[in-house]
Amino acid sequence: MSTKYIFVTGGVVSSIGKGIVAASLGRLLKNRGLKVTIQKFDPYINIDPGTMSPYQHGEVFVTDDGAETDLDLGHYERFIDINLNKYSNVTTGKIYSEVLRKERRGEYLGATVQVIPHITDALKEKIKRAALTTDSDVIITEVGGTVGDIESLPFLEALRQMKADVGADNVMYIHTTLLPYLKAAGEMKTKPTQHSVKELRGLGIQPNMLVIRTEEPAGQGIKNKLAQFCDVAPEAVIESLDVEHLYQIPLNLQAQGMDQIVCDHLKLDAPAADMTEWSAMVDKVMNLKKQVKISLVGKYVELQDAYISVVEALKHSGYVNDVEVKINWVNANDVTAENVAELLSDADGIIVPGGFGQRGTEGKIQAIRYARENDVPMLGVCLGMQLTCIEFARHVLGLEGANSAELAPETKYPIIDIMRDQIDIEDMGGTLRLGLYPSKLKRGSKAAAAYHNQEVVQRRHRHRYEFNNAFREQFEAAGFVFSGVSPDNRLVEIVEIPENKFFVACQYHPELSSRPNRPEELYTAFVTAAVENSN
């Protein structure tokens, strides 16, 4: 069977849920027995989002092979339950840098390097490579931004050319748009969608399906009008209604026959998607009776997308505990020794997630100290693990001024120090310890119990600094347990205080491996401890 290509574009406004629509379709096709992969095209000129501010971009999602990618890849992995790779996120910066390197090496044999064919060919190669490396039946490609953005033009041209390259039966174009509702007039307006499709057709792409984002049901009359003016079949105008829970969306799209229309267009002979397990999960999510309160102490809390995988992992772990996780967003910049008890007193559990830079670190240390001294279940992640070690050094070991060499290079007690292989690296982007690495677990520890007594667990990392082994014996003598280390015992991966109900911190990012129907084990152990603490 020929590989099938589905391209998802957006119009009218950005942030209308293209990624969720693409991920939901991926889940439906996977549940039909098809092998699916998915990728995101981002038209910005950065090589990747690794050096972008979380306020600009939200979370950086790390793949198994160490690519720093768009947060939509997190949605893709959680919905479809697949592990993506570096070919799953492509930016303008990445494409141009590769083309320019080829030009410098003389690979274009003296030709004038142009957007067409060189940039568009490079984009098409990324699409085909993503399919080849995963041996997929179907590849879904989402293009970030909206039709009409000047940055998107080479991407859309590459998508247009794909139809001629692989055949019309192997390509489908899905266009997602906003259908605004004017409350004063009491009606929905189709004109923005019509203009968006007109713009897309002007670039040579005729959409085969429209997905309209609406607050209210559109009605068949609106769908017929859009079908007539946008030249798509009425049944191929699909609603994406606002929902209470994201995981309802695949079921809503299936109910409208979206996946069947896609299969018919692409001539895919696949059985109906069995969504029984997914439906049961959604039903459970919609009927959670109890709540558990988790305080998330972070520096980017004004933009919650900066912690989207953390939030989803907490929710997933709540599902298996039959509780709804209510998150109390605590700005680490506001936390002091004087107000920490007031800010965290009603927390059943406290999580201190990752981050970079000095700002907010002292507030996080106060939150960690509160959790340790008051025996509140606590999970530290990445920087949260490093600050857990610093807090213990200061307030238990009495090492006044203990800090990280990253945050205070002149500290007398560099509890956290730069990794040896990072010392001479000058570039910031793409140079961290990135991707999947193993952690060897200590028998009898809370970490080992969380992971069902596995000897080794593999999780994704994103860091440059590590625990300084010169202090390891001193910590252990005071009851601090290093419950996870690299197989060569050189790098500390997990720490804990066994006397507390749950006081565990890890250098890696467990949230990146969590799925709604298969929550990450360390998060689950943390939420379970928080539930027990609330009773």
UniProtKB/Swiss-Prot annotation:
Pfam families: CTP_synth_N, GATase
Pathway the protein contributes to: Pyrimidine metabolism; CTP biosynthesis via de novo pathway; CTP from UDP: step 2/2
Binding site for CTP: S14, D149, I150, E151, K189, T190, K191, P192, T193, Q194, K225
This protein's record includes keyword Nucleotide-binding: yes
Any one GO BP annotation for this protein: 'de novo' CTP biosynthetic process
Reported regulation of activity: Allosterically activated by GTP, when glutamine is the substrate; GTP has no effect on the reaction when ammonia is the substrate. The allosteric effector GTP functions by stabilizing the protein conformation that binds the tetrahedral intermediate(s) formed during glutamine hydrolysis. Inhibited by the product CTP, via allosteric rather than competitive inhibition.
Active-site residue list: C382, H509, E511
Top-level lineage group: Bacteria
Annotated spans, Amidoligase domain: 1-268
Enzyme Commission identifier(s): 6.3.4.2
Residues binding Mg(2+), per UniProt: D72, E142
Disulfide bonds: none
GO molecular function: ATP binding; CTP synthase activity; glutaminase activity; identical protein binding; metal ion binding
Binding residue positions for ATP: S15, I16, G17, K18, G19, I20, D72
Domain spans labelled Glutamine amidotransferase type-1: 293-535
Residues involved in UTP binding: S14, K189, T190, K191, P192, T193, Q194, K225
Chain sites annotated for binding L-glutamine: Y55, G355, L383, G384, M385, Q386, E406, R464
Assembly mode: Homotetramer.
Family: Belongs to the CTP synthase family.
Protein name (record): CTP synthase
Annotated source species: Streptococcus pneumoniae (strain ATCC BAA-255 / R6)
Gene that encodes the chain: pyrG
